Amino acid sequence: MSTTRKKAPTDFRAVQVELEVKVNAPPQDVWDALVHRTTHWWRKDFYTNPETKGFHVEPRPGGRMYEDWGGDNGALWATVLTVDAPRSIQFMGHLTSQYGGPAHSIFRFAVETSGNGSLVKISDTIFGNLSEDQAARMDEGWRMLFEDGLKPYVERG
C-alpha cells in the first residue's frame, strides 16, 4: 500500500455573487419554470455529461438539484435547504475538484413581483478552493443561466 500526500489548495477564498433579473411574466409563471420546468431552460452547455437526459429540481427540503443521465446515473448539483413557495428556494451545493473545487456553495433563488412582471434575485456564496478566474466566472455563469436561459424561456410562454 502506498500513500501520496498533496499540498492543500492555496486558492481558498469566499465569493459572494448577487444578481437580479427582470422577467416580463407573473411571479407564479417564473416560479413554476424555476422549480418544475428547469430542464427546459437550463443551458445544455452547463451539463457535466453529453448523455444528460434532463436537469431537475425537487422543490422540498432535502430535495435534489441534479442532472439525470438515465437509469440510476447522474450528477447531484445541490440539496434543497429551504423552500418558501412560490417566493424562494435555497440550496447547498458542492464543487468537486473536477469543476474547480473543492468548494461549497449556498445559493438562493427568490421571485418577487416587480411592476407588471417579476424580479428574480440570485444570491450565491461560494467558499473553498477557487482561483481568481473561477471566482470571476461565477457571476458570468449565473447571468448566462438566468438572462439567457430562464428569462427568454418564461417570456416566450
Where are these regions (language model features)?
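A conserved amphipathic terminal alpha-helix motif
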Residues: 2-3, 126-157
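Short, conserved beta-turn/loop elements at beta-strand boundaries and strand-helix junctions
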Residues: 84-89
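Hydrophobic/aromatic beta-strand elements that line small-molecule binding cavities or substrate pockets
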Residues: 19-21, 77-82, 105-113
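Hydrophobic pocket/interface hotspot
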Residues: 30-34, 65, 80, 91, ...
